[in-house]
Amino acid sequence: DRMAPIRAMQVFGDAGGKLEFTAFDTGVSELGWILESSLMACEFWESAKRQGNLTLFCPARPSRLEFRHDAAILELADGTTLSARLLVGADGRDSWVRQAAGLAAVNSPYGEKGLVANFATAKPHRNIAYQWFRDDGVLAYLPLPGNRISIVWSTPDVAADELCALPPEQLCERVAEAGGHVLGRLELLTPAVAF
């Protein structure tokens, strides 16, 4: 009950534009899947543990990085030393690897945030993902199991903060109205967060 297929999409643009497509039309059983990020992270972890050609060092913290002409040498806090011809820094926005390698980064504010929340819907979504390109941003309704959806509303920073501050009933009405009440009345299931 933590993942659901997308069997169709309806995309709405400005000036009344609309695009619809289905998994059936494209010859596949589903266009994609919506699942909780924690479920995907857990599956990635379990898959990594099953790989015969992968050694996991967990938990571990890096303490020192050195580059030689033929290798990158990474020392862990417990004293373990690792050597490789290629070092990939996939450790997030505030990357320790990037900083230790002396690589500069420029952070540019987007000027908008993604508001995320889950709702119960009065009408069934029938595994349809909806997306609206609006003057105030892009809103997506993503199907979850049962009569539930997850929404992502990419909107300017100030608008996202205002939406997060609304009482649940008002947020439900704003999100339902922005989506043309396509799924009827909404009930907030999780707190709205913006990032």
Tell where the protein language model's regions lie, with residue ranges.
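Central beta-strand plus flanking loop segment that forms part of the substrate or channel wall
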Residues: 94-129, 139, 147-149, 155-159, ...
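Short acidic-hydrophobic surface loop/beta-edge motif
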Residues: 11, 74, 129-134, 142
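Short beta-strand micro-motifs enriched in acidic
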Residues: 68, 142-144
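Short loop/turn positions at the edges of beta-strands in beta-sheet-rich folds
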Residues: 15, 76-78, 133-136, 145
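Short beta-strand or tight-loop elements
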Residues: 7, 58, 70, 115, ...
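Conserved N-terminal helical subregion
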Residues: 3-100, 108-113, 168
